[in-house]
């Protein structure tokens, strides 16, 4: 098809199709969040500073607007700033946030959140966690314990474990994806800070090396600037201005 692609638009279309084929491999790649009939539990992981807590806040707003009952859990208990930031998002979008005393056991805060979510017929429970990659063993133990606690209340949860990655960090994002997928099973990626400069070509590398789909994409500062990932639109964005 490339021989016929003399015009830039035709060439761009062929390349986009190729990139989408490459990304979706056998066309079998689920980019959608797996919402459940009852409670959907979403666990968010990722290093500090990649927009993880902000993404949770924006998603809370989005899901609430869709008519879902949303609750947040602040399980990054060792960073006072993280708890305060999530609590502030809760106030801003008017959804409840479950917190514990400072430096309390994250798993116990998660347990409280799970119990409350069941009691209050919540549709979507989103859990913010610590991102201390420099101490992998501790983080792994913490996330494993959180996972066990979640399963004790809802055996098939968490339904999504989403890794937040900053698109502008390039190769570093791939390294983080590798590290986190060793620590905990990751079902999808929230790609943040996609704007003019950060094209996020790293999603192709992550797809190729780790087989983890991007499920959500954050593309700006405003509260509405987050949404589902569509590979074709994304590949088109990667090529904007290049051809």
Regions found by a protein language model. Give the residues of each.
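Primarily NTPase-proximal linker/entry elements flanking Walker-type ATP/GTP-binding cores
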Residues: 1-75, 82-102, 109-118, 122-127
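Acidic active-site catalytic centers that drive phospho-/nucleotidyl reactions
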Residues: 52, 76, 128, 166, ...
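Conserved catalytic-core segment of NTP-binding enzymes
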Residues: 85, 105-120, 134-243
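Short glycine-rich anion-binding loops that position phosphate/pyrophosphate groups of nucleotides
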Residues: 130-132
């Amino acid at each position: 098809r490339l021989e016929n692609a003399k015009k830039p638009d035709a060439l761009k279309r062929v390349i986009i199709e190729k990139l989408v084929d490459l990304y979706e491999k056998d066309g079998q790649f689920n980019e959608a969040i797996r919402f459940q009939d009852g409670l959907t539990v979403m666990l968010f992981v990722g290093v500090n500073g990649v927009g993880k807590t902000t993404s949770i806040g924006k998603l809370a707003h989005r899901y609430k607007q869709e008519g879902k009952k949303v609750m947040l859990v602040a399980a990054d208990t060792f960073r006072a700033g993280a708890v305060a930031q999530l609590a502030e998002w809760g106030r801003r979008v008017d959804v409840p946030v479950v917190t514990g005393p400072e430096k309390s056991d994250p798993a116990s805060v998660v347990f409280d959140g799970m119990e409350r979510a069941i009691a209050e017929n919540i549709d979507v429970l989103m859990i913010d966690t610590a991102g201390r990659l420099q101490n992998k063993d501790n983080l792994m133990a913490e996330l494993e314990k959180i996972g066990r606690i979640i399963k004790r209340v809802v055996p098939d949860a968490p339904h999504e474990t989403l890794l937040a990655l900053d698109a502008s960090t390039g190769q570093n994002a791939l390294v983080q994806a590798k590290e986190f997928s060793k620590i905990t099973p990751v079902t999808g990626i929230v790609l943040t800070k996609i704007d003019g400069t950060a094209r996020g070509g790293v999603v192709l590398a992550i797809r190729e090396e780790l087989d983890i789909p991007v499920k959500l994409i954050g593309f700006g500062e405003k509260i509405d600037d987050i949404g589902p990932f569509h590979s074709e639109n994304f590949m088109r964005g990667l090529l904007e201005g290049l051809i």
